[in-house]
């Protein structure tokens, strides 16, 4: 994806760090100049709300100035400190960005240094947000891996962004499941076996459970192929097929040969491309968990993928507040979406801007062995936060949620139902207890249906893989 331009910056600004200037002009060599320079630098760092977003400089702002020697030495010293490591990401030209709350995968962060909330749902501090962001698994274009299937493709550059975005979302689900939402990437080795094992699953070879190779193979019937771009609905179905295949063949995924949670793909119609509000059916989710637990009545963790079509050529503005609110759910796994033709992994929101991890960076393929706790993992993490106007998101997208247990799922359903009440007749998705038997379509191995909830689900489908069965409501 192309870089976003800088916003709200005057090229005539005199601040040496925020504008990228080396130092002020040498027209005055007095000590007052040095004092003003120090105050300006410190003001840039401390007085305004930190900017945690990637700053893009206008070339016109980089003027060639001849500094006073003392001032220049001081500015270089502070610049070296401030622009080394992650600290530089709090500086930059994006002063137009507000100090509003950031919601990131169900957590709220206060970016303002003033009026800190007493709410237990909010965490204060830019550093805390950046640590959370940089701990998320970042999966990008890779090159130099073994050819995909019978093709000659050894790289997914320019076509694999939807696959990579979906891998990021599922990777977060596995992190939340095995390590918890509060997990942060350790600063020292050896790493935990769970963390390394998750990264191994997303390696770029057929030996890795959730590799691009295996996803394309699983999604063949939905149009997935090396060299071709794919939409979010087909991507969700490819995951459904791959998880089912892994379970049937007892491939090593979580140590027991299974994906460690049930998977429920919910969509609004048969092909997922004509729109219609998806229906999350509680009885279907319960059946999926039962099948996952080999017909035991206990509830299992469950991953919900909800592909949506929220407009024709552009996102219908009425859905924007609803999309933003899904990112406040504790169960949130983010959104597969981005500008048309350029998928990203949207994991947060501030005001009218989506915050995302970008898969469009090309990196060499790496092989992380499942038992190598000293492996280098830096290529799977990114501390550059990118943002995108919400109204520029492609209307075809998918939302993910992870529910750890029955109470967590009930909480999700409660929040989703409240969201329906705010939708003014156009919800993202709805929640029902059961579905009408006459509206269900089963495959040849399917069993009979459940009772009908009061809501009319004609023309909608809620499908999820139930062991060897697939549920569809048409």
Curated annotation (Swiss-Prot):
Q: Which reaction does it catalyse?
A: [protein]-C-terminal L-amino acid-glycyl-phosphatidylethanolamide + H2O = [protein]-C-terminal L-amino acid-glycine + a 1,2-diacyl-sn-glycero-3-phosphoethanolamine
* Subunit text: Interacts with ATG8.
Going by the entry's taxonomy, the superkingdom of the source organism is recorded as Eukaryota
> GO BP, one example?
piecemeal microautophagy of the nucleus
Q: Name one Pfam family in it.
A: Peptidase_C54
Composition bias type Polar residues, residue spans: 439-449
The protein's gene is named: ATG4A
Name of the featured protein: Cysteine protease ATG4A
